[in-house]
Structures are given as structure tokens and as C-alpha cells.
């Protein structure tokens, strides 16, 4: 399989060697190369597309999980934890290895022939190839609706070639500025490209005013109805279970209809917002009464309680509390600091040197009694002991006298979370989540 998956990246890596690393997506990415095949594979499908800066994966899983109670539902998400085929699912079941290999071989054969006609600085995106494979698989499985998650952006993301019935926009903030834009307005305009004329609706999570203004303007221009949380549907009840950090919510629609109580399967207040957004989307798609009836079924609530999304504030231990989250920027870390403001954690940060590790450490200071920076062995990401030296300089670290250190052996920190008597928080990129899964697998061999 590795030899086949190397073909996914061949065109991309060829072009990357001849491109300016600091250039934005609009100068490097070429979604028009995969658009014809994606549009052909997506023909006759009902598709829901999801973008934003935080919570794309969670809300994609929630929407798909609800829809698959009635519809055969395809799900395309990124990134994966251990296997690439985790990104492609039908009714939450991962694509079979034999089918994945067949689609990978056929699809890369087509695109590598196309690559031979391209200049050396122009490449085909691995995401475009995977999206083509996913849509072909969904067609083979005769899905009746698909949920597809964008990558970093929208305007130059290959997924944007997928015809969509509904768009979903999670909170947008400053992130991936090198690729998407230097200002929040540039990033919002990039992601607002999810809104296209002919769509039935677009749903938006809570946004800062500058972002919401851009989304409203785009929706008005494209003549697409925009449904906003807290305006067109809203949480009317929200209570936290202190032991688990999970929330029970109730959601009301604009016409006065209201769901019963639903316990969100993942901890964190933002997951309550994510699930409320999923309720808004699926209420529109299925019909409010049909959704409300489903949410009241105890059998559905039992199934929902077993839904897990690795790396999304994953609870590794309850006593003491040990949490792991794919958090690589300060904005995401602020959510955690607010959510657990009454606790103190030993915080492990595994964020590459070219990402916002300083922002993560600054935001998490209020709930940290110690910070340890570490690294993964993934060759595509750069980590350095110098990161700890930068964190030591932070005012919040100095004022609170928070010990900061660097530990190059991540496995030793995974082992520590098994034996620690103090709350622990592991924050980092998905390569950390993957490293944990691999460590856990070795431990149980």
C-alpha cells in the first residue's frame, strides 16, 4: 500500500521543489486540474460541504451520523490518524482496503498521466486525488447524501469543485496566513467561496462581526439563504456534566419547534455549539419534525453516546483527568482555557516550529502548572528545543512562574499520562494523535 500511496504525492512533491514555500495558495494550487474528474464523479449526488477554522471535522461527523439514521451517507474528512483510508467512509464504516487500493491505483494512474503534460512547478493536489476516489466510492456504494470537509481553505481547495446543496461554515479566525491570507478579511473571503449560486442554503456558526458581514454579503450576492446560529436556530438549554465535561443541550428552530434534551458525545462547550449547528443543518435537510422525533429516541441517544472522534478533546483518563486535543493555534487553546478555568494541568505541547506553538502556550497559561514541549518523528514537520526557549520568554509564563521544559521522547510522555496523579493535557498536531495511536498499539501487542 505504501508504494501506491507514494503515487498520491508524486506530482505534488515534484512541483513543490520548484515553488516558493512562502507563496499563497492562489499562486501554487491548481484545483482546475482535478475539477473535471471530481465533477463527473459527483454527478447526481446530494452533497453537503463543510469549511471553517475550527470544528470542521466534528460537525462533519455529527451531520453524517444523524443523516445516516435515514440515508446512506458518504463522509470525506481529513486528516487521518493511522491510515489514509480513514478519510473515506460510508455510514461511518471505513472504505475496505481492497476497494481503496483499487481506486487508488486507477485514480493515480489517470492523474499521473496528466502530470506528465504539466510544467515542473505545477502539481496535482493529493486532496484532489483523494476527493475523486471518495466520490467514486460513494457512487459505487450508491449513497444518497455525502458530507465532505474542506482542507485549510476553500477558494483554491480541490473540494470546491464538488456541486453542493448545502454549505456549512464553522468559526473563521486567523490561521494558515501564509496560504490563505494575512488578514481575517482575506481568510474569510477565501472561505466564503463555499457559497455559490444555485445552492439551497448555507449555515453559519458564530462568527466575529467582520467575518459575518463578509458571509452575509456573499450569500446576498449569490442569492443563497443564510441561516445563522442564535438567529435562525439557537441553543435554549445547555448544562455541563462536571465529571465528563460533556453538555446536554436543547435547540429551538425559528418557527418555535424545539428538540428534546440531547447529550453531546464529545466534551467541551464548543462541541455543544458544533452539535447545535449539526441540528440546524439536518433539521433543514430531513425536516424539523423528523429530526426532533429521532433525537427523542433512546436507542438513537445510546448510539450517539458511542460516537468518538479521535483527537477532538479525547478523554484518555477520567481520574485524574487526562485530555488530548488536536490544537495547533492560540484561538483553539483559548476555548480550552475557558472551558477548564477552574483546573490546573501539566500541559504537553507538540506543535511544529512553523505553527502557532507560542500562541498555544500563551493561551493555555491560565490553566497550566507546567508546560512541556515535545516532538513527533514525522519527517515533514520541524520541531526544536529552541521552541521551549521562546515559550520561557512569555510574560504570562514568567509572571506565573510556570516551569517550561523540552522532552524529545514523546513516548515517555504518553507513558506518563498512564501513571500521573495530576490532570494532564496533551495538545498538538494530528501527527501527535497518530503517534499516540501507534504507541497505544505497541503497548497492547
Where do the PLM segments sit?
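Short functional linear segments
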Residues: 1-52, 59-69, 76, 115-119
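ATP-dependent carboxylate-amine ligase catalytic core
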Residues: 36-43, 71-162, 178-180
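Short Gly/Thr/Asp-enriched flexible loops that form oxyanion-binding sites at enzyme active sites
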Residues: 63, 153-165, 437-440
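Beta-strand->loop->alpha-helix junctions that form or flank phosphate-binding loops
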Residues: 76-79, 204-206, 218-241, 264-269, ...
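Acidic, Mg2+-coordinating active-site environments of NTP-dependent enzymes
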Residues: 114-118, 141-142, 149, 164-261, ...
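Nucleotide phosphate-binding/pyrophosphate-handling subdomain across enzymes
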Residues: 145, 157-168, 172-176, 186, ...
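C-terminal helical cap/extension that packs against the catalytic core
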Residues: 208-227, 321-324, 361-423
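Alpha-helix capping/helix-boundary segments
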Residues: 431-432
